[in-house]
Amino acid sequence: EIGSGLVGSEMCIRDSFTTFEKILWIGSIVLITGSAVMFGKDGILSVIASLIGATSLLLNAKGNPIGQALGVIFSILYAIISFSFAYYGEMITYLGLTGPMALAAFISWIRNPFAKGKAEVKVNHIHRGEVLFMFILAAVVTVVFYFVLDFFNTANLIPSTVSVTTSFLAVYLTFRRNRFFAVAYAANDIVLIILWSLAALTDISYISVVVCFVIFFVNDIYGFVSWSAMRKRQAAEIQP
């Protein structure tokens, strides 16, 4: 069943993008590559991670499970970049939380297609009780990670801790196939733009990472718009 979902995803990737989405992807690639060329150190690794990340976000915006698979790869590369600047919070978050949850989301999305053989996940709605549970769990994770990050003398502790909170909310909602995952990721992008801007004050090469998350922010906003439209369309198609 998972194999057939993958085949469907691969077959539909090329033909499913709108003109706007193609422009968005090409624009993201050009800006990411340009910023990496302009700024030296870690440029190659940053650009590879960013290109994978941008492609992942566009596929996620389409509800395509392949986007989550690319998200696992991005998590590993981003953790390496974070380690280079002693952002242990980011490293631990992406290796211990975002990466594994992206893998879990990949499996969840593959197992819950909107229609058999289609490379589009079924949009899910979560109720108030689960929303409350999610925020309580996020609070617990935040407190635990604060002390862990403090123990490792993490650079810029407060924004690093806030990033853990937004990352957790994002990966939880992604796993649950809820459209607000894109809003949580957009919030996380803002935190990371601030975080890496602080890093860029010390090492200008990290400007390429800042550019990466500005682009991610734009893609995540589009992801929410896309999922909102997808939710309405799926609801209309289900109606008898």
Model features per residue range: what roles?
Residues E21-T33, A49, L137-A139:
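Alpha-helical transmembrane segments
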Residues G63-S108:
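Hydrophobic/aromatic-rich structural module bridging two neighboring secondary-structure elements via a short loop
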